UniProtKB/Swiss-Prot annotation:
Keyword Ubl conjugation found: no
Assigned keywords, A-Z: Ion transport, Membrane, Mitochondrion, Mitochondrion outer membrane, Porin, Protein transport, Transmembrane, Transmembrane beta strand, Transport
Annotated source species: Homo sapiens
Annotated protein name in UniProt: Mitochondrial import receptor subunit TOM40B
Lineage: Eukaryota, Metazoa, Chordata, Craniata, Vertebrata
Gene Ontology CC: mitochondrial outer membrane translocase complex; mitochondrion; pore complex; protein-containing complex
Domain of life assignment: Eukaryota
Family annotation (Gene3D superfamilies): Porin (2.40.160.10)
Residue segments, region Required for mitochondrial targeting: 281-308
Entry's Gene Ontology BP terms: monoatomic ion transport; protein import into mitochondrial matrix
Length: 308
């Protein structure tokens, strides 16, 4: 008897399982579209500042700040923060209560709450001594691939005035995010609305963002050259003020020296830089900054010490 070979019919060949596509990510908040680029630029410093941070527990910490400047009177700020037990990410903890009060009694306070798994709420209050300046309420819903936000600013039912801001962001692909912003304001004898469209494209080493509306345009480009060098380019145009600004920022990290350098140059002939130096094993950070505006012939320099 000869050997019998069984051949499977062509139609019964094993099929490959269909490739499952990864779900689109959440685009984040509208206010964070330009954050990567803005973090490259240095914060302006002037005068001498001493900051002492103290962690009282795993949930509560305080900070004392003393600022002396040639442009104004010396000031003192007390900063307190409370963080709850619900941590969604390394930078998001709920509930969170943050407050800052200066020596004149003015208060800035912010409360963050997680009402549901996808629903967040925020309340912001600002006072000047005994007078309320700002009260703002935000509601944000984060879906699988979109974010919707509604903000009410200074609502006054008696005076019939309010500022409403609506944001929406949608992830179209893993790299492309599109959305918009609608700002509506109303007060006696006046009301209006401004629509702004936004887009963000994220590559492996760079991010480009653009906001365009009737009020102007805001474009930014962030590029991470390597683990130490980051650059940012920002363009802002305001149609109401008829003003246009172009800025270039530079961020350099030197881990072996425990130093961080930030610099900027803009189209208003302003040049500035801030150098931060950590002093291990002491919990001390030194910062030295200088800013020169050639057009207005103004020079500002500052020095700060942060403990804790």
């Amino acid at each position: 008897m000869g050997n019998t070979l069984g051949l499977a019919p062509m139609g019964t060949l094993p099929r490959r399982s269909p490739r499952r596509e990864e779900p689109l990510p959440n685009p984040g908040s509208f206010d964070e579209l330009h954050r990567l680029c803005k973090d490259v630029f240095p914060a302006q410093m002037e005068g001498v500042k001493l900051v002492v941070n103290k962690v009282l527990s795993s949930h509560f910490q305080v900070a004392h700040t003393i600022h002396m400047s040639a442009l104004g009177l010396p000031g003192y700020h007390l900063h307190a923060a409370y963080a709850g037990d619900w941590q969604l990410s390394p930078t998001e903890v709920f509930p969170t209560v943050v407050g800052d009060m200066d020596s004149s009694g003015s208060l800035n306070a912010q409360v963050l709450l997680l009402l549901a798994e996808r629903l967040r709420a925020k309340a912001v209050f600002q006072t000047q001594q005994a007078k309320f300046l700002t009260w703002q309420f935000d509601g944000e819903y984060r879906g699988d691939d979109y974010t919707a936000t509604l903000t009410l600013g200074n609502p006054d039912l008696i005076g019939e005035s309010v500022i409403m801001v609506a944001h929406f962001l949608q992830s179209l692909t893993h790299r492309l995010v599109l959305g918009g912003e609608l700002v509506y304001h109303r007060r006696p004898g006046e009301e209006g609305a401004i629509l702004t469209l936004a887009g963000k494209y994220s590559a492996v080493h760079w991010v480009a963002t653009l906001n365009v509306g009737s009020g102007g345009a805001h474009a930014s480009y962030y590029h991470r050259a390597n683990e130490q060098v980051q650059v940012g380019v920002e363009f802002e145009a305001n149609t109401r003020l008829q003003d246009t600004t172009f800025s270039f920022g530079y961020h350099l990290t030197l881990p072996q020296a425990n130093m961080v350098f930030r610099g900027l140059v803009d189209s208003n002939w302003c040049v500035g830089a801030v150098l931060e130096k950590k002093m291990p094993p002491l919990p001390v950070t030194l910062a030295l900054g200088a800013f020169l505006n050639h057009w207005r012939n103004r020079f500002h320099c500052g020095f700060s010490i942060t403990v804790g």
